[in-house]
Design a protein with these regions (language model features):
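Structural detector for internal amphipathic alpha-helices that build alpha-solenoid repeat scaffolds
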Residues: 1-4, 19-34, 42, 50-64, ...
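N-terminal intrinsically disordered, low-complexity tails
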Residues: 9-12
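Solenoid-like repeat scaffolds
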Residues: 76-78, 136, 170
Length: 175
């Protein structure tokens, strides 16, 4: 665990340091855990895309504790570039981010849905089953969003989507 003073020093290095300092700061911030989440998100909100890239990499290392705060910041921030880098961080977290990202698709969050869709496509295989479950929703729009996302995943999602549609068609015909 890294204390607040050290985290602040590392974030300053991330913002102002030469390449090697930024790389080391990214690694140490990523290893700092939850205490570094808010300062990293603040750096992403205030910084340029280089800083966002390094901060996103550190957030990927931190993983699950960063998911909720990242989603909250994405909702609050109107900056498209910030949202894009935050989405990349969520995609880099893989399995841990699937459930909250699928919830954004299910709830048709107008602000974050496109970012969630992109992240889920990047995550790939771990997102397939949760999206297949969304296709069982009573809401046709939710079914449509899930099917479209599976299709856009390419081979990873299209095969399971096709099988689900065939199985669903058979079940409907047997009623």
């Amino acid at each position: 665990m890294t204390d607040k003073t050290r985290i602040d020093e590392l974030v300053t290095g991330l913002r102002q340091g030469p390449l090697e300092v930024r790389r080391k700061a990214t690694a140490e911030l990523g290893a700092s855990g939850e205490a570094a989440v808010a300062p990293l998100i603040a750096a992403m909100l205030e910084g340029d895309n280089d800083i966002r890239w390094y901060a996103a990499r550190a957030l990927v290392q931190i993983g699950e504790p960063a998911i909720g705060p990242l989603l909250d910041a994405m909702r609050a921030a109107g900056d498209h570039d910030f949202r894009r880098y935050a989405m990349a961080a969520l995609a880099g977290m893989g399995d841990a981010a699937v459930k909250p990202l699928v919830a954004l698709i299910e709830n048709a969050d107008p602000v974050l849905q496109p970012f969630a869709a992109t992240a889920l496509m990047r995550i790939g295989e771990p997102a397939v089953e949760p999206l297949l479950r969304l296709m069982e929703s009573p809401d046709p729009k939710t079914q449509e969003r899930a099917a479209l996302l599976l299709w856009k995943m390419g081979e990873t999602g299209a095969g399971p989507l096709t099988e689900a549609l065939i199985t669903g068609s058979r079940s409907a015909n047997n009623k």
